[in-house]
């Protein structure tokens, strides 16, 4: 299980440093009685930016979960990024989940599109169309198209994506991060079979979301 990233995500290092300095300064001036809420805040920030390695299933037609969280949608829907009817599976991340995003399949990035938008509660269905979001369209070696959409939430105001069109992605590979609560929508080819249900807790990479059909 090779995961070449720090167990505490780099995206969080500045926030952790600021929280630690503030806690230390207040502790030095007013003691633990005054500083304990800031130490608690530091613990929260550290846990928010944790980014542990995960086991990656090897099943050939498996679509892996791109994020930790809870399933809030499993439905047939239009994929506006690949202009097709698709199976849509949505994962909602609260502030206690790991917030890095990992590729659901092996493939090549066909396009990356960013859309500015609102910051509604990411658990709501309308967040898919109205919130700030970033779509990554991936084509597998077998010719299947898989779309993964990072969606900002009520608190999240910063979507980070580290891949560009033409670049390869491996299943389980870390490709993005959303700070402070968010959602990821995955659009799959018609004929894909969902392996999760609404309300189910899922883990990035190690949970199989769905199985792709044999033919594109």
Curated annotation (Swiss-Prot):
Q: Name one Pfam family in it.
A: PS_Dcarbxylase
Named from the GO MF annotations, one term is: phosphatidylserine decarboxylase activity
Please name the InterPro entries in this protein's record. Answer: PS_Dcarbxylase (IPR003817), PSD-A (IPR033175)
- GO terms under cellular component: plasma membrane
Q: Which residues form the active site?
A: 182
Which cofactor does this sequence's record say it needs?
pyruvate
- Reactions that this protein is recorded to catalyse: a 1,2-diacyl-sn-glycero-3-phospho-L-serine + H(+) = a 1,2-diacyl-sn-glycero-3-phosphoethanolamine + CO2
* Pathway, per record: Phospholipid metabolism; phosphatidylethanolamine biosynthesis; phosphatidylethanolamine from CDP-diacylglycerol: step 2/2
What UniProt keywords apply to this chain's record, in alphabetical order?
Answer: Cell membrane, Decarboxylase, Lipid biosynthesis, Lipid metabolism, Lyase, Membrane, Phospholipid biosynthesis, Phospholipid metabolism, Pyruvate, Zymogen
The answer to keyword Lyase applying to this record is yes
Q: How is the cofactor bound?
A: Binds 1 pyruvoyl group covalently per subunit.
Q: Where in the cell is it found?
A: Cell membrane
Topology class, membrane:
Peripheral membrane protein
Q: Which family does it belong to?
A: Belongs to the phosphatidylserine decarboxylase family. PSD-A subfamily.
The protein's name = Phosphatidylserine decarboxylase proenzyme
Q: Which organism is it from?
A: Burkholderia mallei (strain ATCC 23344)
